[in-house]
Amino acid sequence: MTSLSCIPTRCLAVLVALALTLASSPASPAATAAPADDKKTTRKKARKRASRTVRVYVGTYTKGDSQGIYQFSFDTRTGKAGKVSLAAKTPDPSFLAIHPGGKHLLAVNETSEWDGLKNSGGISSFEIDSKTGRLNLMNQQPTRGAHPCHLVIDRSGKTVLVANYTGGSVIGYSILDDGCLGPSSSFVQHTGSGLLKPRQAAPHAHSINIDPSGQFAVAADLGMDQVLVYRFDPAKGTLLANKPAGPKVVAGAGPRHFSFHPGGRFGYVINEINLTVTAFSWNSKAGTFKEIQTISTLPPGEKQGEGMSTAELRVGVRGRFLFGSNRGHNTIVSYRIDRKTGRLTYVSNYSTGGKTPRNFGLDPSGRFLLAENQDSDTIHVLKIDRKTGKLAETGSVIQVPSPVCVRMLAIDTAK
């Protein structure tokens, strides 16, 4: 640094005079406001980027090339995806759920043995690194039933419910404040069978969901041809069988996944074996369903072919459309929802661009559907016409080994 003694006397006098002039002059409003405005504009742009960018987590089966859970960024305005990377190594994380707080992710481990315990899979809790998206393992618990295939976290974030497919049961675990899995809060073993043996010789709980009121849990059991209803106590995390127990579907239909309409008056189940969707009205006070209709997941007049089955079902972001996936047929079916009656009207079937679309995700904007082709190792991004419900190709294809579930989390880039 140059000292004052090194500055010539004439120059020093000029500098002092200039400093006194600036000190006595009133500050320019534009000059003082500009930095604040610039910061405000920067923050606004950052929030805009954050609101349109999500981090996508992909659950997989790890029998082949997959090592666990993968991640990539996704722009919900353009449909473009970022680079795919491994978020966590873990066995067969076939279904995922993001905690309401956004800091943790839970995954089932769809196995038949867990930590030396036979006839049990596992559930894992991960902490999300907000900067990198990587998942850091917190802890794990056994599910007390083989091949857990679905899970849901209640809106308070204090309980996770899991469906065990081969075990034919559902189990609940408490979630502690630090994101770790606590003690088991409930366990229910299903009993019964269905029409088609050996496929339906035993119960097979394929999904569990919580209704919009937060007071009931609904388990679709493929083996029993039944949608079972439980009273859910969010304070204790317990499940109590409702009376009546829940509706039966057509014998041999095989109910798989369930989706409530956000309005809370209707629910829909996709039937894996006979390729149909059954619509129900929902009484959220009594916890009872009444069937409205059953409709095919194939184009009108087309018959079910060998090797075909359904998989995922989701009500669209704004509650106007319902989407379902057909494996073997390798399409996504779209229906229009009558928001007064709950009835479905067929819109179209659209190719997923690959084989075996086990699952798909809808981005928060409602513009895009991400179809996971399990046997093609691809995720195809399809565009949703938000007026008609029809799908269209975007040309965006993401390579992920054995993808079977996606979950999305907003990336906060605002400072």
What are these regions (language model features)?
Residues 65, 90-101, 144-155, 191-215, ...:
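Beta-rich, blade/repeat-based domains predominating
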Residues 72-79, 126-133, 173-183, 230-239, ...:
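Short loop/turn segments immediately following beta-strands, especially the blade-tip
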